């Protein structure tokens, strides 16, 4: 089998995994039907995991296959996590905010919402660190959003190592693809490497 055939096979398997996740989520979250139909899927060598620009879910095939094999709930959560990023316009709303803190705030907001659902296909035991952060967020924010979390974290004067520790806890997807929105006018810039339809 040549390299082209291998890539096509990996692409087929990756697409099947993401479609399976989408179908499973849809069964229990029909209220998100429109959002579930919004993504296309593409292999990417720009990430070692998964990520979205709002149009595509990009994935490293070996990473996705291994995650699916060992922890389907993680794949479901990652899919939902990226949907929430897009629904709440996280990729395009940074607007001068400090990137690392904005990325963390978006991840906390998305995970906070996911952890509020009782659906077994996404439920996971929470770590002590996650519970600690949620306690701080819930005690200080009435309606959790990335913007509110960002204001809270900014006001806390966190050291870089604290931000890194929280980021390690809440990071699910790669935000590298959000760079299509990083320009002065905030116009959507389609990436040069956009896969064909």
Q: What are these model-derived regions, one by one?
A:
Residues 1-76, 83-197:
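Short, functionally important secondary-structure microenvironments
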